[in-house]
């Protein structure tokens, strides 16, 4: 998938599939699938490193995981999250952070929020030739300001703000916008108001595409079960079964067998 395909898919009403990915083996699997695009999300801080929030993701962490994923991917378009405060200190600092991610293999960056400074930064990056994906609704990097993980845009004032944010991000030059944890009717309204595509997570079926976290949709963990996640596989159960089978065969001296020995 190329950058221009995002808008083409919206025009042709073809849904966009996006999935997070954090390491080389997983990227190699994704490369053989029909997934359109991959996000090296700052959710790696939680899903892989065990931190309680995405705030703990650093530019070094994002750079390392981007390098690993880029080495394994094939035709999929690769986007990397700019981590917490990665675009807040100065434009020069932001450009340097983005440069590191692009040199690591990202083809675009995703930036959370739509305040005036953020939109100016996005516009600056786009004018420099860097593709930027926006992100509105529940923005995990602002989780303390939002008062926790909860649905955004539930009243008319919040809904109008989100609609304006989406429009502002489009005007700033974003090629797509993620809408997270927003009522489906509002997400559909935002989607219909934009020329650029929307990618939803917890935003209903009316967006131009969907994104899920690798570990969530494959059932690699069972402690986090938000309503918007569908588990397409029960990987954790199968992994535990395989591990216990290995232990049993070692104890019973069924492994290694002759075919595993020299």
From Swiss-Prot:
SUPFAM superfamilies: Phosphoenolpyruvate/pyruvate domain. Its EC number is 2.1.2.11. Mg(2+) binds at residues 42, 81, 112. InterPro entries: Pantoate_hydroxy_MeTrfase, Pyrv/PenolPyrv_kinase-like_dom, Pyrv_kinase-like_dom_sf. Pfam families: Pantoate_transf. Its cofactor is Mg(2+). Binds 1 Mg(2+) ion per subunit. GO terms for cellular component: cytoplasm. Pathway: Cofactor biosynthesis; (R)-pantothenate biosynthesis; (R)-pantoate from 3-methyl-2-oxobutanoate: step 1/2. It catalyses: 3-methyl-2-oxobutanoate + (6R)-5,10-methylene-5,6,7,8-tetrahydrofolate + H2O = 2-dehydropantoate + (6S)-5,6,7,8-tetrahydrofolate. GO terms for biological process: pantothenate biosynthetic process. The active site is at 180 (proton acceptor). The keyword Transferase applies. Keywords: Cytoplasm, Magnesium, Metal-binding, Pantothenate biosynthesis, Transferase. One of its GO terms (molecular function) is magnesium ion binding. 3-methyl-2-oxobutanoate binds at residues 42-43, 81, 110. Its main location: cytoplasm. Homodecamer; pentamer of dimers. HAMAP family: PanB (MF_00156). PANTHER family: 3-METHYL-2-OXOBUTANOATE HYDROXYMETHYLTRANSFERASE. This is 3-methyl-2-oxobutanoate hydroxymethyltransferase. It comes from Legionella pneumophila (strain Lens). The gene is panB.
């Amino acid at each position: 998938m190329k950058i221009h395909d995002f808008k083409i898919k919206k025009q042709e009403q073809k849904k966009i599939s996006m999935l997070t990915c954090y390491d080389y083996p997983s990227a190699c699997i994704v490369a053989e699938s029909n997934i359109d695009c991959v996000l090296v999300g700052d959710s790696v801080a939680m899903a892989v490193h065990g931190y309680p929030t995405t705030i703990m993701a650093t530019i070094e962490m994002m750079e390392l995981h981007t390098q690993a994923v880029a080495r394994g991917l094939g035709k999929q378009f690769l986007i990397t999250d700019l981590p917490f405060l990665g675009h807040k200190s100065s434009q020069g600092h932001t450009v340097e952070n983005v440069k590191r991610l692009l040199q690591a293999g990202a083809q675009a960056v995703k930036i959370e929020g739509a305040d005036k400074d953020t939109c100016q930064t996005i516009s600056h990056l786009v004018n420099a030739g860097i593709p930027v994906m926006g992100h509105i609704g529940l923005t995990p990097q602002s989780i303390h300001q939002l008062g926790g993980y909860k649905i955004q845009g539930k009243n008319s004032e919040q809904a109008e703000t989100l609609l304006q944010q989406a429009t502002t991000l489009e005007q700033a030059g974003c090629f797509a916008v993620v809408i997270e944890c927003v009522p489906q009717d509002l997400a559909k309204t935002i989607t219909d108001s934009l020329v650029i595509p929307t990618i939803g997570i917890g935003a209903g079926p009316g967006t131009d595409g969907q994104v899920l976290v690798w570990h969530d949709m494959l059932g690699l963990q069972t402690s986090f079960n938000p309503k918007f996640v569908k588990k397409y596989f029960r990987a954790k159960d199968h992994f535990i079964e395989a591990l216990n089978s290995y232990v049993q065969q070692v104890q019973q001296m069924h492994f290694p067998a002759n075919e595993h020995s020299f």
